[in-house]
């Protein structure tokens, strides 16, 4: 219902609605993660990943990623498959390389996170930039009228996520 409302309201205001499904979680665990608590799942780490038992990125969203595609087809709205795009990026980097996209920090590495973090859901600044760029390109392909506005800028942000310095 909310996706349909979003599309209707966007069209009423003269906008171009584009629907996305979810980005993937960095989850290489073939063990069945029977956990409907998103916060616990976000923090799921099996002893620093020594127990990884899959070389395949495992879906953690289930049917949730299908609904936006169905609504997009039903309402004739452009659709961006963020699940596939991010799955391809994560798998191209592999188990260890994909950490570079996420909030994986050792204790003391980032002042604002003194205890460190092993977060397989949220992107760090580098990961956010990579994913945002890929998704912006996908919007440009899905909606050529918007594609001419897609830009990729260089920018500098400190490890703490502070700063707003761009070069054109």
Model-derived features with residue positions:
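Alpha-helical cap/lid subdomain in secreted, periplasmic
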Residues: 1-147, 168
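N-terminal secretory targeting modules
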Residues: 142-168
């Amino acid at each position: 219902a909310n996706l349909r409302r979003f599309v209707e309201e966007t069209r009423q205001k003269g906008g171009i609605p584009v629907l996305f499904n979810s980005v993937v979680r960095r989850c290489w665990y073939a063990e069945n993660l029977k956990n409907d608590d998103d916060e616990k799942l976000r923090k799921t780490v099996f002893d620093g990943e020594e127990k990884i038992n899959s070389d395949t990125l495992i879906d953690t969203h289930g049917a949730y990623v299908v609904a936006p595609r169905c609504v997009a087809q039903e309402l004739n709205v452009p659709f961006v498959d963020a699940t596939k795009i991010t799955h391809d990026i994560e798998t191209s980097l592999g188990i260890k390389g994909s950490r570079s996209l996420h909030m994986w920090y050792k204790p003391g590495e980032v002042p604002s996170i003194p205890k460190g973090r092993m977060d397989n859901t949220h992107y760090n600044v580098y990961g956010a930039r990579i994913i945002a760029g890929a998704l912006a390109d996908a919007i440009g392909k899905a909606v050529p009228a918007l594609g001419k506005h897609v830009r990729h800028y260089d920018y500098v942000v400190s490890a703490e996520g502070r700063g707003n310095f761009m070069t054109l």
